[in-house]
Structure formats: structure tokens, C-alpha cells
From Swiss-Prot:
Keywords: Disulfide bond, Protease inhibitor, Secreted, Serine protease inhibitor, Signal. Serine protease inhibitor that inhibits trypsin at a molar ratio of 1:1. Residues 28-33 form a propeptide. This is Kunitz-type U15-theraphotoxin-Hs1g.
Amino acid sequence: MGTARFLSAVLLLSVLLMVTFPALLSAEYHDGRVDICSLPSDSGDCLRFFEMWYFDGTTCTKFVYGGCGGNDNRFPTEKACMKRCAKA
């Protein structure tokens, strides 16, 4: 039973890394922290329907957020997105 539990843990860790690592590679870092404005849009894991805004590298764009999961490049309004991510 110990081997099966170990293999399950390894499989879970592998899946988490495959999901998380590409997003981290695409992000920009400032002072060792992820710049949330450089993250891709991410609708999350749930199936609800919330109109939100994300920064696409140039401007703020509307997208549908499912209500859970996702990343921090998600804002309730275009104004909030621009305030946080647009460079003067």
C-alpha cells in the first residue's frame, strides 16, 4: 500500500507542476515577485459566469471568469485593470 500512495503523490505533484509551471514561465518578475499584469487570462476551474477584465500586455480586455481558481490578472472593472496594469 505504501508504494501505491507514493505513486499517487508523485502523479499529483507531476500534474500540479505541468499546470503551474507554464504560467510561471510566461510571467514577468519584478523584485522577485510575479508581475500579475503579465500573466495570461485564466477563466479558472468553476462554471459560473462573471465578466471580468485582464491585462493582455497592451490594454485591458473583457473575459469570462468561472468563479474559482485562475490567477491574479483579473479585475472587476476596466478602470481597476488600467489603474493596476497600464504604464503611464
